[in-house]
Amino acid sequence: NLRLDTTAQREVLYGHDVVSDIFLENLKSATPWILKSVNIKLLADQVDHGKRDHLLHICAHFSNLIKVSEQVGVRHDAGRALLRLAHLLATDQRNEIAVELLKGLEVGEYEFSKYIPEYLGEFALWLPPEQLDDMIERLHILLANGNERIVSVALDTLGVLLECYSRYTVRFHESEEVSEERRMKLLGLILSCLANYREQVRQEALLVIGQHIFGSQILAERDKSRMFSLCAKKLLFLLNENKGGELSLYYRAATLSHIDRFIAHYQLFGGLVETRTREKIAFFPGTFDPFTLSHKEIAKKIQELGFTVFLAIDEFSWSKKTQPHLVRRQIVNMSIAD
């Protein structure tokens, strides 16, 4: 732009292999954060100019910076650069990077892992359907982890996946039925955490529902309306079932504020928000056993026929082990929340 001769500078940048030197410099704790950010832009610029011999190593380097960098700005610069280069990677390379980021969630140090979901959620949407389903299943397993911090970041990742999921159908051209089924699975996993017995997990679920679904600037209003019609009744039930302490009150208020704002905006510009109602009623005979998968499948099949299914719970059976009614009620809630 200044009409200066930059031949010498271009020779320095693109005439030599500087990638390994940058890798080494970025991993030094003594390197100032501003230099690391410039190095990230330089590595991405190398790829933009056709030097793709080290593409996988550059993306792996970015994923490492997201996981271990001490400076938040460097993490975000690396994350944005990784997402910008994701489409250039081969399928197996994308899976390798996604697995590395997923391992970062399992560290359990929330101060480091809390920045990963924002980028893992979007990056995972570059995986083909089979690998994406495997990623969702691994996140599902993490939701049962004993460490609440690991559960929280897994939940955040599911929220980002659901929020940005509309991009996936454009990239991989799946049928509407398959796409909707996966979207409902993601929503079900988030709702299942709202029935969790740990208050911190329930709070994180409320945060995800409020910010990544109904408060999202990415999700289309039509998609929000469809999800609201599916989960409104269950959401209302679970909010009243596990009220938690004073801090949960503020989480609940923030989530309801996002939902209220969405409803007001949708009714003003899009039309009425409808909720699904079923006029047909079915009672599940005997005591519902949440540990028996066949019981749950029977109830789901009846529900798919258009029935509202009521489940009976008492203090007995379940292999003859007596438990308090409210304890059993909470176990059943966790079983059917998805």
Model-derived regions: residue spans:
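HEAT/HEAT-like alpha-solenoid repeats
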Residues: S20-T31, A60-E70, V99-V107, I136-A144, ...
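Alpha-helix N-cap/helix-start positions at coil->helix boundaries
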Residues: P32-I34, Q71-H76, E109-K114, E148-S152, ...
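Nucleotidyltransferase catalytic core that binds NTPs
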Residues: P117, G121, L142, S152-D338
